[in-house]
Amino acid sequence: MSNASKKVIVGMSGGVDSSVSAYLLMQQGYQVEGLFMKNWEEDDTDEYCAASDDLADAEKVCETLGIELHTINFAAEYWDNVFEYFLEEYKAGRTPNPDIMCNKEIKFKAFLEFAAEALDADYIATGHYVRRQQRDGKWEMLRGLDSNKDQSYFLYTLSHEHIAQTLFPVGELEKPEVRRIAEEQGLVTADKKDSTGICFIGERKFKDFLQQYLPAKPGPIESVEGEALGEHEGLMYHTLGQRKGLHIGGMADNSGEPWYVVDKDVERNVLIVAQGKKHPRLYSQGLIAGQLHWVSRNAPPEAFDCTVKTRYRQQDIPCRVTPLSNGDFQVQFKEPVAAVTPGQSAVFYSDDVCLGGGIIEQRITDFEVKL
C-alpha cells in the first residue's frame, strides 16, 4: 500500500510544529487533512485564552496547504479525564503534570478514536518532537532528534499500538529547520512563538487560575527544625525545590542563603523549608513510582539498570529500577537528586528509547529496599 492511498489526520494546534508536520506528510505523498481540537470552554472575554487565535492560524495554514480542516470539541472529555484529575492532585498536596494526562486521554485516545472512526484515518500525526522505530515486530518511541525540544517525557503513556498508528514528522528535525521550512512555504505560523504554560491555562497567572476552582488554605511555613518562619497562602501554590515567592527572606542561620521548599505536611497544612540549595532535605536517594505505563505493555519482571528523568529537560539520571510486589516500582539513583516531586512523572530510558514511566508516589531519602 503506497502512501498515496493512506489518509493521515494531523492534529493542528495553530503552531509551527503541526503546520510543518502537515506539509511534510503531503510531501511524502499521504492524503492529509487537519483536525483542530477545542479542549477548554473559555470565556470569550478572557484575555489569556488564545484558542480562537490558534484556530484562525490553523485555518490559514490549511488554506495555504490546500487541505481540509475539521474541528472537534473535546471539552467534556478534557474536564472529566484531565482537569478533575489535575484538581484532585493539587487538593492532595501533589504537583501534577496535566500535559501528560492530556496526551493520554485526549490526543492519543479521543483524537485517535475520532480520526479512525469518524474520518476513516489510517494514521494520525502530531507535531511532537519524538521518533519511532520498529523492533521485533513492535513499535518503540525514541527521543526527538533535537535534544532541546525532545517531548518523549510527556508521551510515556503511549503504547506500541498508539505509536504504530501515529506519525511524528518533525521528530527527525531540529527546531530551526522546522521554522525554516514554514517560512519557505509561506505558513503564517513560521514565526509564532512556542506555547508555554499548562495546556488549558495558557499564559495566565497560575495562582489566579487555581483560585477559581480550589479555595486557598493559608497555613504556617516552618523550617526543618520546626521553627515558625511565616505563612503560606496555600500548599497548592508551592512545589518542591521552589525558591521564589516564599517571602521569608534570609533569616534563621543568618547565612543569607535562600530558602527552598523541601516538603509539604498536608495533614497539618504546613510548608517545610530549608536554607541553601545543598541542604540534604532537598535531595532524594530514590523514589517509588506507581500507575506505571510501559511502551511495550510488558512490565519488566525483574530489576534492571537504565536512566530516568523526574522532570522535563532534566539530565538523565542513572538508576536501578526494581519491581515491587504491589505493582509499583522502586527507583534507586546512582547519586542524590534534588527536588523529586510527588505527582510528577518518572520516565525511564535505555539510550534513546523511552521505555515508559509512572507517577512519583513518594521520594526515598534514606534508602531501604522495599520488596
From Swiss-Prot:
Keywords: ATP-binding, Cytoplasm, Disulfide bond, Nucleotide-binding, RNA-binding, Transferase, tRNA processing, tRNA-binding. It comes from Idiomarina loihiensis (strain ATCC BAA-735 / DSM 15497 / L2-TR). GO terms for molecular function: ATP binding; tRNA binding; tRNA-uridine 2-sulfurtransferase activity. The active site is at residues 102, 199. This is tRNA-specific 2-thiouridylase MnmA. Its EC number is 2.8.1.13. GO terms for cellular component: cytoplasm. NCBIfam families: PRK00143.1 (NF001138), trmU (TIGR00420). ATP binds at residues 11-18, 37, 127. HAMAP family: tRNA_thiouridyl_MnmA. The keyword Nucleotide-binding applies. SUPFAM superfamilies: Adenine nucleotide alpha hydrolases-like.
